[in-house]
């Protein structure tokens, strides 16, 4: 079984420049709707079936939560169901928003 890799927000930003990389944001709906990285997939228990249908097991998946803790559990789960390249972003959205652009609603 493969394992996920913990990466920095800088490494995540670099990976997101590559084609066919998925950013999965696992924060709660109100936080996600208020602000998120443009193009992020909002991964929840409800959207998991859609995620597994749309995102192939070979697609690199970057998992983002608030600070980089909860994302590790989800990253571990994704590897356990066969995703081959899974990354947990240390610092999460809180780290990202201080350095990189994101979409916010007023």
UniProtKB/Swiss-Prot annotation:
PROSITE patterns to which the protein is assigned, alphabetical: RHODANESE_3
Reactions accelerated catalytically: thiosulfate + hydrogen cyanide = thiocyanate + sulfite + 2 H(+); thiosulfate + [thioredoxin]-dithiol = [thioredoxin]-disulfide + hydrogen sulfide + sulfite + 2 H(+)
One Pfam family matching this protein: Rhodanese
Matches recorded under SMART domains: RHOD
Active site, UniProt feature: 65 (cysteine persulfide intermediate)
GO MF entries: thiosulfate-cyanide sulfurtransferase activity
One Gene Ontology biological process: glycerol metabolic process
Domain Rhodanese: 17-105
Keyword Kinase among UniProt keywords: no
Enzyme class name: transferase
InterPro entries the UniProt entry points to: GlpE_sulfurtransferase, Rhodanese-like_dom, Rhodanese-like_dom_sf, Thiosulf_sulfurTrfase
Gene3D superfamilies to which the protein is assigned, alphabetical: Rhodanese-like domain (3.40.250.10)
Domain of life: Bacteria
Primary location recorded for the protein, binned into one broad class: cytoplasm
Keywords: Cytoplasm, Transferase
GO CC term (a single one): cytoplasm
Family recorded in the similarity comment: Belongs to the GlpE family.
Function of the molecule: Transferase that catalyzes the transfer of sulfur from thiosulfate to thiophilic acceptors such as cyanide or dithiols. May function in a CysM-independent thiosulfate assimilation pathway by catalyzing the conversion of thiosulfate to sulfite, which can then be used for L-cysteine biosynthesis.
Name by which UniProt lists this protein: Thiosulfate sulfurtransferase GlpE
Organism annotation: Tolumonas auensis (strain DSM 9187 / NBRC 110442 / TA 4)
